[in-house]
Amino acid sequence: MLLTPAATADASPMEQSFEGNPIVVINITYEAGIGGGSDIEGDIVLELFLNWAPITVTNFVGLVNESFYDGIFFHRVIDDFVIQAGDPTCTAVGVYPASDPSCGSNGSGETIPFEADANLTHINGALGMARSVDPDSASSQFYICDGPQHGLDN
């Protein structure tokens, strides 16, 4: 992942870009293998809302700056729901929850408290921190919404 200054976004509080917010660019490479398909490479650009989730943003940016996410797989990809990554043990080709149940259950070792803000909602492309049933259990795992997922709000 690369942290870079840039502008992004569209229009709802989260669909507007706010000057000074950190922008994270995730470079994705997919090499077709036994799953088939075509090789793909591209960037996912995320704006982080520092005013609405300062602890979460500081944690995420810190992990990016430490290269924590480099080489980590998206271990959960569910069409019309989310794509999820951030488990440091999910780095070997072919290691996914189906073949290694521990893949997808680990994190950075540090947890952060849940931050709620009325402006934060699970719109298409929204970034969220994965957590267990304990609201204060987020660590390094994150997801990106594939379509609106308002059932995940709060």
Predicted regions and their residues:
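Cyclophilin-like peptidyl-prolyl cis-trans isomerases
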Residues: L2-N154
